[in-house]
Amino acid sequence: MLKKFLKGSQAPDPQSKPKESEEILEEQIDAGIKEFKRSNRNLFVSAFTAGLEIGFSVLLMGTLYSLFVGKVSPESMSLLLAISYPIGFIFVIIGRSELFTEHTALALLPVLNGSVTLRNLLILWTIVYVGNIIGGLLFTLLLVQIGPSVGFIQVDSFYHLAKKMVDYDWNTILFSALLAGWMMGLLGWLVT
């Protein structure tokens, strides 16, 4: 359904019957199996691209922080940054890149179904995770070097954004990550 939406097709027919949960699960398993059939190289390039695309969230948040710090209330700043956060995820969805949080659920289904081995799952997860990290790091290095030099991002915006992300104890960060992964899996289920 999301693919149809992105292609600009019309809304689903209201007369059509909703899919049964078994049909959705089968589609999710098939989608997961297709990921395992991709070459490691293509999977890595897609994951690397997703890491770069997610960086646009930080770029936009850092730019907005630099432009509006001290000019708007802290509450307005928090809202502005929260609204701008999803842009990188939108790029990932439109670009059909491979983000690790998507694979935590989607790739697990064929393993639970017995279609794919646990070893293959770990290989896929490693490729996607490493690709995401390398893409994200490269984007970050470029952003940190170029942003302040050109003047569209102040250095203190990086400190502000990082502090907001890691200013919690480890278990809060862990459970937040688990919740985010679960929500991405749920999103995959809902758009099917």
Feature roles, as predicted:
Residues 2-192:
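Alpha-helical transmembrane segments and their helix-helix packing motifs
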